[in-house]
Amino acid sequence: MILQHILILSSFLFCLGIFGLITSQNMVKILICLELIFNAVNLNLVIFCKFFDSSAIIGNLFGLFIIAIAAAEAAIALAILLAMYRNRRSIRIDRFNILK
């Protein structure tokens, strides 16, 4: 029963992240929604590992690996965002046409 509740929570977090990713115009909100998606996937991975093979630690290790990759991605994205803000004085996604 608890597996179903956690899967519902995880799918709600994933859908909330996708909705925010599609509708948001602010780069910081987009990064937060992307992290929300990563955390929903991470929650699924850890809970499936716990319920199907509780003696294996590989799911928890993959979870830690995903957290480390997400932290590195967020740091790089925030550094790029800071550099773009210094040039454009805005963090709205529709105003970024530097790459064209």
UniProtKB/Swiss-Prot annotation:
Membrane protein topology class: Multi-pass membrane protein
Catalytically driven reaction(s): a plastoquinone + NADH + (n+1) H(+)(in) = a plastoquinol + NAD(+) + n H(+)(out); a plastoquinone + NADPH + (n+1) H(+)(in) = a plastoquinol + NADP(+) + n H(+)(out)
GO cellular component term, pick one: NADH dehydrogenase complex
Record keyword Electron transport present: no
Record InterPro entries: NADH_UbQ_OxRdtase_chain4L/K, NUOK/Mnh_C1-like
Pfam families the UniProt entry points to: Oxidored_q2
Entry's Gene Ontology BP terms: ATP synthesis coupled electron transport; photosynthesis, light reaction
Keyword Repeat carried by entry: no
Keywords: Chloroplast, Membrane, NAD, NADP, Plastid, Plastoquinone, Quinone, Thylakoid, Translocase, Transmembrane, Transmembrane helix, Transport
Coiled coil: none
Chain ranges passing through the membrane: 2-22, 28-48, 61-81
Sample GO molecular function, one term: oxidoreductase activity, acting on NAD(P)H, quinone or similar compound as acceptor
Listed EC numbers: 7.1.1.-
Subcellular location: Plastid, Chloroplast thylakoid membrane
Family: Belongs to the complex I subunit 4L family.
Assembly description: NDH is composed of at least 16 different subunits, 5 of which are encoded in the nucleus.
Cited function: NDH shuttles electrons from NAD(P)H:plastoquinone, via FMN and iron-sulfur (Fe-S) centers, to quinones in the photosynthetic chain and possibly in a chloroplast respiratory chain. The immediate electron acceptor for the enzyme in this species is believed to be plastoquinone. Couples the redox reaction to proton translocation, and thus conserves the redox energy in a proton gradient.
Entry protein name: NAD(P)H-quinone oxidoreductase subunit 4L, chloroplastic
